[in-house]
Each structure stands twice: as C-alpha cells, then as structure tokens.
Swiss-Prot record:
Gene of this entry: rplW
Entry-linked PANTHER family: 60S RIBOSOMAL PROTEIN L23A
HAMAP family for this protein: Ribosomal_uL23_B
Protein known as: Large ribosomal subunit protein uL23
Pfam families: Ribosomal_L23
GO biological process: one example: translation
Length: 95
C-alpha cells in the first residue's frame, strides 16, 4: 500500500478552484495511478475530514517547444473533492 502523501501531490490554486471553495469543494493534483477510493482515504487521513464525493479528470500535457526541440508537459490527474457539511480543510483557509 502506498503512503497517503504519495497520492496527493499538491493543491490546485486557480481562480476556478477558489470559486469552488464556496461549495465546499477542494481541488488537488493527484497521482495518475490513484483511484477514487485511494484519493478519498488519503484526504480523510491527511486532513482529518469526511469526504462526500470525489470527481477525477485526466489532463493531457500540452505540447511545448524550446527552440528547435519539441516536447510536452507531463500528463496529470486532477481530483475535485466534495466534503460533507461542517468540514473544512485548513490548508485553504484565508485564500
């Protein structure tokens, strides 16, 4: 079993994700191999909250160029976590 901190990579801090905070939804970049159950367990254990639902989406990396060299940004997986009423993640407070 993987460590919970290996599943949750980082929070997403964008205008859209900050607007979702009003609906008690939090957005994170997660490990591409993680499923919804693993993500739910990781969030509940790291932040000590109760998760209502997990929505995930796979994001393809954009093509990038550096001079004559072509490449692409890495693919990633994003998870939108809905918490049960009365629960908040302190990491996002004050944003």
């Amino acid at each position: 079993m993987r460590d919970y901190r290996d599943i949750i990579i980082k929070p997403v801090v964008t205008e859209k994700s900050m607007n979702l905070l009003a609906d008690n939804k939090y957005t994170f970049i997660v490990d591409k191999r993680a499923n919804k159950t693993e993500i739910k367990n990781a969030i509940e254990n790291i932040f000590e909250v109760r998760v209502a639902s997990v929505n995930t989406m796979n994001i393809k990396g954009k093509p990038k160029r550096m001079g004559r060299f072509e490449g692409k940004k890495p693919d990633r997986k994003k998870a939108v976590i809905s918490l049960k009423p009365g629960h908040k993640i302190r990491l996002f407070e004050g944003m």
